[in-house]
């Protein structure tokens, strides 16, 4: 822990240095947090959305969280999504995390978090592949932004055998970049061909369904529904529908939320990823599987706390000794 009243500021460069090469560690960390959440050892309230009437696609989201398992950590992630940033050469998302002392509530760390957010999203998706599917024979990727690239990287870290990667994106420049980065097994394909792979990754900024309503996935397929709003409700109606957290995901007009509204019930829910990790549920092999992770703030906090502990040992970061001023009363 930082000295009493001190604030540790950790910038993007330190975050990147910490995350590099730690794919296996992060996947296992995410599994541990999912287990803690399933056991009731977390507090993960609803996300809070700040929206702008004149620019409805833009939003800033607050994700407060608390974990009480091997380590005790509380805090909040504040993450923005401004899709039009990409038209100006900027990343769509930016984020920070504040960690708070669970004894007195005082904040002790302020951390650049867009990279943490991408890494924990990718680690969660890779864990779902490991638990729900196993090694893919082909990977279809819809979207080629940072989340798609990071998730593909984490999935590939699980397995030594290279498989075809088929990528579809409306942005030709971005998709060319990801194809170049991931080597000769990557190719640019149509949406239909990408959706035909046995492992499908949806990572776009779509706000409403655009995949044709007629699309139906096959029993051998796992769909990582990262962006949550690409598919029509009918497409997932008969699938094995797996979530990180049911209550979190069934809101904000995600595809599962739309299906709940159409059905008037939640009978389409198969379970949470933690239930499969703990061998409490089984997939129906006669149906495809769709994993829809809303994204839990507890994952961000776990990664941020591990990073904080690493930086404390290394002595890096910017320390503000009297950040809170006179704390006595």
Give residue spans per PLM region:
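Glycine-rich Rossmann-fold phosphate-binding loop(s) that bind the pyrophosphate
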Residues: 144-145
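N-terminal ligand-binding/catalytic initiation module
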Residues: 1-118, 126, 298-301, 308, ...
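N-terminal Rossmann-fold NAD(P) dinucleotide-binding loop
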Residues: 148-149
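Short helix-loop-beta connector
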Residues: 132-139, 161, 218
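NAD(P)-binding Rossmann-fold cofactor-contacting core
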Residues: 158-179
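Short acidic low-complexity segments
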Residues: 184-197, 214
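Adenosine-phosphate binding glycine-rich loop
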Residues: 14-16, 234-329
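Rossmann-fold NAD(P) dinucleotide-binding segment
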Residues: 199, 207-227
């Amino acid at each position: 822990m930082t000295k009493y009243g001190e604030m540790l500021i950790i910038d993007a460069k330190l975050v990147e240095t910490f995350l590099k090469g730690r794919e296996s560690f992060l996947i296992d960390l995410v599994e541990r947090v999912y287990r803690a959440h399933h056991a009731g050892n977390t507090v993960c309230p609803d996300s809070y959305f700040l929206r702008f009437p004149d620019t409805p696609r833009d939003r800033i989201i607050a994700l407060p969280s608390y974990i009480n398992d091997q380590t005790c950590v509380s805090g909040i992630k504040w993450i923005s999504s401004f899709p039009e940033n990409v038209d100006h050469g900027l990343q769509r998302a930016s984020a920070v995390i504040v960690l708070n002392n669970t004894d007195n509530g005082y904040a002790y760390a302020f951390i650049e978090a867009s990279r943490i957010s991408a890494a924990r999203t990718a680690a969660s998706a890779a864990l779902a592949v490991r638990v729900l599917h196993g090694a893919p024979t082909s990977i279809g990727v819809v979207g080629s932004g940072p989340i798609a690239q990071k998730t593909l990287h984490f999935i590939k870290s699980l397995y030594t055998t290279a498989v075809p990667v088929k990528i579809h994106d409306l942005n030709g420049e971005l998709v060319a970049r990801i194809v170049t980065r991931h080597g000769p097994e990557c190719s640019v394909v149509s949406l239909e061909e990408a959706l035909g792979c046995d492992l499908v990754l949806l990572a776009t900024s779509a706000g409403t369904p655009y995949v044709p309503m007629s699309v139906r996935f096959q029993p051998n397929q796992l769909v990582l529904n990262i962006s949550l709003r690409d598919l029509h409700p009918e497409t997932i109606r008969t699938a094995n529908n797996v979530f990180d957290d049911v209550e979190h995901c069934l809101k904000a007009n995600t595809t599962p939320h739309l299906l709940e509204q159409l059905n008037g019930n939640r009978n389409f829910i198969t379970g949470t990823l933690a239930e499969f990790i703990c061998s409490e549920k089984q997939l129906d092999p006669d149906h495809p599987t769709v994993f829809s992770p809303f994204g839990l703030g507890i994952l961000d906090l776990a990664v941020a706390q591990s990073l904080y502990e690493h930086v404390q040992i290394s002595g890096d970061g910017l320390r503000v000794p009297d950040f809170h001023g006179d704390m006595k009363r």
